[in-house]
Every structure is written in structure tokens, then in C-alpha cells.
UniProtKB/Swiss-Prot annotation:
Residues that span the membrane, as ranges: none
UniProt keyword terms in alphabetical order: B-cell activation, Cytokine, Disulfide bond, Glycoprotein, Growth factor, Secreted, Signal
Residues modified by glycosylation: N62
Protein name: Interleukin-4
Gene name of this polypeptide: IL4
Presence of the UniProt keyword Ligase in the record: no
RNA-binding found in the keyword field: no
Primary role: Participates in at least several B-cell activation processes as well as of other cell types. It is a costimulator of DNA-synthesis. It induces the expression of class II MHC molecules on resting B-cells. It enhances both secretion and cell surface expression of IgE and IgG1. It also regulates the expression of the low affinity Fc receptor for IgE (CD23) on both lymphocytes and monocytes. Positively regulates IL31RA expression in macrophages. Stimulates autophagy in dendritic cells by interfering with mTORC1 signaling and through the induction of RUFY4.
Positions of disulphide bridges: C27-C135, C48-C85, C70-C105
Gene Ontology biological-process annotations: B cell activation; cell surface receptor signaling pathway via JAK-STAT; immune response; interleukin-4-mediated signaling pathway; macrophage activation; myeloid dendritic cell differentiation; negative regulation of apoptotic process; negative regulation of cellular response to transforming growth factor beta stimulus
GO terms, molecular function: cytokine activity; growth factor activity; interleukin-4 receptor binding
Highest taxon in the source lineage: Eukaryota
Residues annotated as signal peptide: 1-24
């Protein structure tokens, strides 16, 4: 009985420590995969890279990082659902971003300036590399 009461705090501590390790490790894996996909996409010469997208980074200052990632996901979905190019990469990028994004957001295309898909992906790559360096 004495051993069990001493063992419980140790087991709880180990559980907490490993959950923090796994969470940090997942962050590294997801970000690394996003950056790898962005590197592939931004080096491709493809007419889809010149498609117009809403400039989701031109959001108000109080927009959270999670909202920004959500907005990027919306634009990626709009592209890969309506065009047949780069579907595999854009779909995978969307799925990975979804794990870092808030669940709801909106992109008001009427009020936002436009950019190209290539510009959006280049800017996202810069943000993700910075985030990865802090992970």
C-alpha cells in the first residue's frame, strides 16, 4: 500500500512529461512537413501559381495566427477545388494547416486586395520557417 501511494505521483509526472514531449515533437513534424511542401510548391513552374487569391495576410492587426492559417486554408481549398493543378500538394498543405488553424474564420473577398498563389505560398513559407525556429 505504501509503494502504491509513492508510485502514483511518479507515474503522473512521467505522463505529463511525455505528453509535453509528444506535443512539441508533433509541432516539429507538422511544421517540417508544411515547409517541405511549400518548398516543393514554390519551386514549381506552373500556371496555377499565378492564380489570383485574396491577400489573407492583409488582415487587421488583431487577427490571430490561428485565424490567419484558417484564412490561408480557405484560399487553398478554393484553388484546389476549382482547378486541377497542384491538388495533391495544396490538399496536403491544407490538411496540415488545419491542425494549426482555428476552426472558423472568414475571408471577405470583396474587401481584400488580391495576390497570386505563389506570393501567398512564399509568405506562408517565411512565416512557417520563423515558427519552426521557435518550436
Amino acid at each position: 500500500m505504501g509503494l502504491t501511494s509513492q508510485l502514483i505521483p511518479v507515474l503522473v509526472c512521467l505522463l505529463v512529461c511525455t505528453s509535453h514531449f509528444v506535443h512539441g515533437h508533433k509541432c516539429d513534424i507538422t511544421l517540417a512537413e508544411i515547409i517541405k511542401t511549400l518548398n516543393i510548391l514554390t519551386t514549381r513552374k506552373n500556371s496555377c501559381m499565378e492564380l489570383p487569391v485574396a491577400d489573407v495576410f492583409a488582415a487587421p492587426k488583431n487577427t490571430t495566427e490561428k485565424e490567419t492559417f484558417c484564412r490561408v486554408g480557405i484560399e487553398l481549398r478554393r484553388i484546389y477545388r476549382s482547378h486541377t493543378c497542384l491538388n495533391k500538394f495544396l490538399g496536403g498543405l491544407d490538411r496540415n494547416l488545419n491542425s494549426l488553424a482555428s476552426k472558423t474564420c472568414s475571408v471577405n473577398e470583396a474587401k481584400t486586395s488580391t495576390s497570386t498563389l505563389k506570393d501567398l505560398l512564399e509568405r506562408l513559407k517565411t512565416i512557417m520557417k520563423e515558427k519552426y525556429s521557435k518550436c
